[in-house]
Amino acid sequence: MSKYTILDKINTPSDLKLIPESQLKILSAELRAFLVDTLDVSGGHFASSLGATELTVALHYVYNAPYDNIVWDVGHQTYIHKILTGRKDKLVTIKKDGGISGFPKRSESEYDTFGVGHSSTSISAALGMAIADRLQGKSSNTVAVIGDGAITGGMAFEALNHAGGIKEDILVILNDNEMSISDNVGGLSAHFSKIISGGFYNSIREKGKEVLKNIPPIFEFVKKVETQTKGMFVPANFFEDLGFYYVGPIDGHDVTELVKTLRILKDHKGPKLLHVITKKGKGYTKAESDPIKFHHVAPSFHSGENITTKISKPTYSNIFGDWICQKAAKDKRLVGITPAMKEGSDLIRFSQLYPHRYFDVAIAEQHAVTFAGGLACQGLKPVVAIYSTFLQRAYDQVIHDIALQNLDVLYAVDRAGLVGADGATHDGSFDLAFMRCIPNHVIMTPSDENEAYHMLEFGYEYNGPAMVRYPRGAGIGAEITGSLDLELGKAKIVKQGSKIAILNFGTLLPLAKQLAEKYHATVIDMRFVKPLDEIMLDKVSQTHEIILTLEENCIAGGAGSAVNEYFVAKDLSNKIIVRNFGLQDKFLNHGTKDLLLAQSKLCVENISQELDKLI
């Protein structure tokens, strides 16, 4: 007999609505158990979905998706949503090749109203949907679900300001668990914590309700006017000042209260915000105790069987973490900045050793970059540790605030290139292209851990904006040497061959070496995308017939394009054959990195096929 007696009856939200409300609590427990059992096989984002279980059940119980729009922010918390919307049997394939996405994806399900993976987008998208439906005569409801981490992003406030200003009928649910991935920081987070802590208003409100319940007519009246009397007890609510009808905070794990509240708010027109308090990792003791560790789990995390051994080689993030701690010990001007990615960027040790020189600015990439500019103006040496996919959110600041003024800022760009299971929303496919066109920048692409370490050092000492991009995961195990012969804009010949030259940008050097063995090709580790080693390019063009460029970045506008531009400017394009190999002009689905590289023709077999046609 199945242990999922209620869940087995549910494949769609229509099935969910047939379940008696009295059984929703049991269903929530079954959903958590199913999530544990499934992710123990597949792995995936875990703690966030545990924390949003009752909220997800209540939303699909009250609202009529997909006619009603439920828009999720970031998407880490949507596994329960996927289970309830026809993907229960596919959950075991999540983030696998050919399986379902780890995030909401419009092409995957009509219930996924808006594709997501980055934060702070839900309110803007939901507002657009609400207005579009209204203009087309639809009577649908629109809900945006956003966490207390994501709501610190500036875009969320822009959308709140717009929605409140035009009085659009939209519900924003603030899922407040006091923790996104890393601990939340900033004034707004402190504001939420103060509300949760049980201040005077919440105390008197609950005690007053107990008394007034004995006088039903007055109790009902007070409930209706409650929001109008808040000012008697507390300062004007932040969200009400933005034009929202504010309700909360309420218990996000009381499914009965959630259903009741959502039904009331469904009939209340205009902008409203429901503030729910949840616990990340709810229902799984270890995840409740350490939600950061259990934010994402590997297969067998629960059963303990076939536990993957730890990676013996350090990751590129570890290399950065070591470098910044060592450099900070030598240079008191160094300050480290991250937009809410302390763990991912390996800044934990730095934050502990140098708390007054460590700044987690929350999910605020634009602010992170300009903040770094301000620090640089006053003589400090800021290092911005940021994922490639998030750097693109601060593009204007990179150009206008840093490059234009030639400020001394080092970008340590993590997760450059393909990231694998997280898919297109998290791939670092574009940074070389969008950074290369900006004046005053130095751009470096290390081929191994040792180059990464010394390029960070070089970029730090360089007087002006500099960027070092490195991939997710471990490298080849290169030893960190005491020094490295590194000169601005100078490449290194790794292997001398003939006829074919392979210009490598980044960590595809092992691939270049494999090709060189097969074709007796010259291999050059270019090291710098900007400035290019033009002397080396001149030499190669004079001594070789075919030139290949390799990069884990989009071909359009990338490092290979820079090589092409140089050869065209020198009138060499008709004298040599140049082929660029990099990421194709399309968004890739999730899968293993090796598979995605092969799909991008970045493997020996595919490149050999192209070479054989040219020889």
Swiss-Prot record:
Its cofactor is Mg(2+); thiamine diphosphate. Binds 1 Mg(2+) ion per subunit. The keyword tRNA-binding does not apply. Its EC number is 2.2.1.7. Pfam families: DXP_synthase_N, Transket_pyr, Transketolase_C. SMART domains: Transket_pyr. CDD domains: TPP_DXS, TPP_PYR_DXS_TK_like. One of its GO terms (molecular function) is thiamine pyrophosphate binding. GO terms for biological process: 1-deoxy-D-xylulose 5-phosphate biosynthetic process; isopentenyl diphosphate biosynthetic process, methylerythritol 4-phosphate pathway; terpenoid biosynthetic process; thiamine biosynthetic process. It is an enzyme of class 2 (transferase). One of its GO terms (cellular component) is cytosol. Pathway: Metabolic intermediate biosynthesis; 1-deoxy-D-xylulose 5-phosphate biosynthesis; 1-deoxy-D-xylulose 5-phosphate from D-glyceraldehyde 3-phosphate and pyruvate: step 1/1. Thiamine diphosphate binds at residues 76, 117-119, 149-150, 177, 284, 365. Keywords: Isoprene biosynthesis, Magnesium, Metal-binding, Thiamine biosynthesis, Thiamine pyrophosphate, Transferase. Mg(2+) binds at residues 148, 177. The keyword Transferase applies. Belongs to the transketolase family. DXPS subfamily. Catalyzes the acyloin condensation reaction between C atoms 2 and 3 of pyruvate and glyceraldehyde 3-phosphate to yield 1-deoxy-D-xylulose-5-phosphate (DXP). Homodimer. This is 1-deoxy-D-xylulose-5-phosphate synthase. It comes from Francisella tularensis subsp. tularensis (strain SCHU S4 / Schu 4).
